[in-house]
């Protein structure tokens, strides 16, 4: 079908009748089969039909979309929650031009508690692993420095495991001696007792610090009555630490003790900046920012999309019972039903007009306006830097897509390459790529930066398409690295691409065919932009190199276990994700890994716990 449905009423009506009145997702395609829009509804038929009534309810942008629709597809789901999750996945996969698309602003950090382990770890991460259903993620948090400070303070208040893996095989480390750790590595505390401590820590990150303080005060009083003064003093110190944490972590809002989220936005011609405030027990405990392109969307639709994105991966305990919105949402009933089902209790979405709730929305909106102004200043600064870059490098126009490449290794060991991408002067991390160097000439004791750069260039640019063609390529290095890359591009017929190298010492810019490097003043906007691009490539390559080196070192430990070949080592690492978790796993957990079995699990366990070999089974009387 290449004719728009709007031009063929009979076909349109036939297509609409095929759509069931059930929950699900619909996809609208144009004459080239491109997906223009993805939507969801409790009743697919009535929602899709509403696009073709032309009653004036549609925005001008959506009206432009409707006249292009040549085909409508639908996917029926069992319920609204499945429809919302599917819609979210399809939008992220296909990036339809008429959907509200959130920009890759930043990955906020989370706090993870690994309840899937007998002795749960508590750590900060920017990557949520959704396949471990028992693990809990708290956040996201906008200030990673404050999160690190909070976690550090929590680890001083409560005795928790301080290391991901034991320092010694046969004895606890200094953290046990000074009371910072209960001796997890040597089994000096039972999993049940340790998990009770971790549950108290979880209350802090669920916004239940006041409740935890009340609980500890009751225990302190009870311990004092029983003349257990050592325990009472320990509870007293924990209470003081929690009160200090509460003072440093939260901002009180006037005339409120409620827990709710509030969301508002500010827009200009190009973008929308959205702010979401998280209020728990009358205190502001978190503030999140989102950025969306402004393509003529209804502001309420943008807010709705952000809420879907945010709560999609939230733990149910993180969803408040009340969410305040700047505008009335078009799918409010749908979202309330989905959130209530996810939380297991009623969740209300309100667009307040007066009193304290409206004042909170006004506060969020003011912060969104400030963020929009900051974002606009940043965009103008980057635009000026790109114009300057085009000027000094003789480019026909300011480059939009910039790519940088770096190599990282130690004397040829664990050699890797990195590709980072900036779009409009800002990192576009969804386009970053990492490369393991495969060249046999690059091996421990034999490094070859030129060959490594050539390999990465060949692997990247042999697969280049018109959609990901860079406007500028930057190599971390000097003349030699630049020549190696240009030789590969010449083989591929791509030597017309603008490629440059930036040397670290003098920050000299090398250009193909020019024996003299270009030197720019230290504060030149073009130089500063190239330095940021190069430094990001270096950071990304170094992080990947360290990861590969760590994996190799972990694998070398596993290689010492008899009967544990490469394939089984890989299965163990995939199941537990780190050597530290393998070391503290029980025999039963090890045996559950496919391909391991009880016998090999016992062998692995005894390798890390040699004291277990001396424990004889009890004999029958």
From Swiss-Prot:
Main localization of the protein described in the UniProt heading: cytoplasm
Every GIY-YIG domain range: 21-100
Family the entry assigns: Belongs to the UvrC family.
Keyword Magnesium in record: no
Residue ranges that the Swiss-Prot or TrEMBL entry lists as coiled coil: none
Pfam families named among the record's database cross-references: GIY-YIG, HHH_2, UVR, UvrC_RNaseH, UvrC_RNaseH_dom
HAMAP family with a match to the protein in the record: UvrC
Gene Ontology CC annotation, any one: excinuclease repair complex
Species: Synechococcus sp. (strain JA-3-3Ab) (Cyanobacteria bacterium Yellowstone A-Prime)
Classification via PROSITE patterns: GIY_YIG (PS50164), UVR (PS50151), UVRC (PS50165)
Function, as annotated: The UvrABC repair system catalyzes the recognition and processing of DNA lesions. UvrC both incises the 5' and 3' sides of the lesion. The N-terminal half is responsible for the 3' incision and the C-terminal half is responsible for the 5' incision.
Protein name per the record: UvrABC system protein C
Keyword DNA damage included in the entry's annotation: yes
Record keywords, A-Z: Cytoplasm, DNA damage, DNA excision, DNA repair, Excision nuclease, SOS response
Subunit and partners: Interacts with UvrB in an incision complex.
One record GO biological process: SOS response
InterPro entries per UniProt: DisA/LigA_HHH, GIY-YIG_endonuc, GIY-YIG_endonuc_sf, GIY-YIG_UvrC_Cho, Hlx-hairpin-Hlx_DNA-bd_motif, RuvA_2-like, UVR_dom, UVR_dom_sf
UniProt-annotated location(s): Cytoplasm
Residue stretches making up the UVR domain: 210-245
Entry's Gene Ontology molecular function annotations: DNA binding; excinuclease ABC activity
């Amino acid at each position: 079908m290449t004719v728009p449905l709007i031009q063929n009423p009979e076909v349109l009506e036939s297509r609409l009748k095929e759509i069931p009145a059930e929950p699900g997702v619909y996809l609208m395609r144009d004459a080239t089969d491109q997906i223009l829009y993805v939507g969801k509804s409790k009743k697919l038929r009535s929602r899709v039909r509403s696009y073709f009534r032309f009653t004036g309810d549609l925005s001008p942008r959506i009206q432009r979309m409707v006249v292009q629709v040549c085909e409508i597809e639908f996917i029926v789901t069992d319920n609204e929650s499945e429809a919302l999750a599917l819609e979210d996945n399809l939008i992220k996969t296909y990036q339809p031009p008429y959907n509200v698309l959130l920009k890759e602003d930043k990955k906020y950090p989370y706090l993870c508690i690994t309840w899937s382990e007998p002795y749960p770890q508590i750590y900060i991460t920017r990557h949520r692993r959704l396949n471990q259903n028992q693990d809990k993620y708290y956040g996201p948090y906008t200030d990673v420095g404050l999160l690190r400070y909070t976690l550090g303070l929590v680890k001083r208040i409560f005795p928790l495991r301080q290391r991901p893996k034991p320092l010694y095989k046969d004895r606890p480390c200094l953290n046990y001696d000074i009371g910072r750790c209960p001796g997890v590595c040597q089994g000096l505390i039972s999993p049940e007792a340790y998990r009770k401590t971790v549950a108290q820590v979880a209350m802090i990150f669920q916004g239940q610090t006041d409740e935890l303080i009340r609980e500890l005060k009751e225990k302190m009083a009870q311990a004092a009555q029983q003349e257990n003064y050592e325990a009472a003093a320990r509870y007293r110190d924990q209470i003081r630490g929690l009160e200090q944490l509460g003072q440093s972590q939260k901002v009180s809002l006037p005339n409120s003790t409620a827990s709710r989220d509030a969301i508002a936005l500010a827009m200009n011609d190009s973008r929308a900046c959205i702010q979401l405030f998280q209020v728990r027990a009358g205190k502001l405990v978190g503030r999140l920012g989102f950025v969306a392109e402004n393509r003529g969307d209804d502001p309420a639709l943008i807010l709705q999309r952000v809420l879907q994105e945010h709560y999609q991966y939230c733990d149910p305990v993180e969803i408040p019972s009340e969410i305040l919105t700047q505008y009335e949402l078009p799918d409010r009933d749908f979202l309330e039903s989905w959130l209530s089902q996810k939380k297991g209790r009623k969740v209300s979405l309100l667009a307040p007009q007066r009193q304290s709730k409206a004042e909170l929305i006004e506060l969020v909106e003011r912060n969104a306006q400030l963020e929009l102004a900051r974002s606009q200043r940043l965009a103008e600064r980057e635009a000026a830097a790109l114009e300057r870059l085009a000027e000094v490098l003789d480019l026909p126009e300011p480059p939009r897509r910039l790519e940088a490449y770096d190599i990282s290794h130690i004397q040829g060991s664990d050699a890797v390459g990195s590709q980072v991408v900036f779009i409009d002067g800002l990192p576009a991390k969804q386009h970053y790529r990492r490369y393991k160097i495969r060249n046999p000439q690059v091996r421990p004791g034999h490094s070859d930066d030129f060959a490594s750069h050539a390999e990465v260039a060949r692997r990247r640019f042999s697969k280049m398409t018109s959609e990901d063609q860079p406007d500028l390529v930057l190599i971390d290095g000097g003349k030699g690295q630049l020549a190696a890359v240009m030789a590969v591009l010449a083989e591929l017929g791509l030597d017309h691409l603008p490629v440059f190298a930036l040397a670290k010492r003098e920050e000299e810019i090398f250009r193909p065919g020019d024996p003299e490097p270009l030197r720019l003043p230290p504060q030149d906007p073009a130089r500063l932009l190239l330095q940021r691009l190069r430094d990001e490539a270096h950071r990304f390559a170094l992080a990947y190199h360290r990861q590969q080196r760590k994996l190799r070192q972990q694998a070398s430990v596993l290689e010492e276990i008899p009967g544990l070949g490469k394939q089984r080592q890989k299965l163990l690492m995939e199941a537990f994700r780190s050597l530290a978790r393998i070391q503290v796993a029980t025999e039963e957990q090890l045996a559950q890994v496919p391909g391991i079995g009880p016998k090999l699990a016992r062998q692995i366990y005894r390798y890390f716990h040699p004291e277990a070999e001396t424990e004889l089974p009890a004999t029958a009387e």
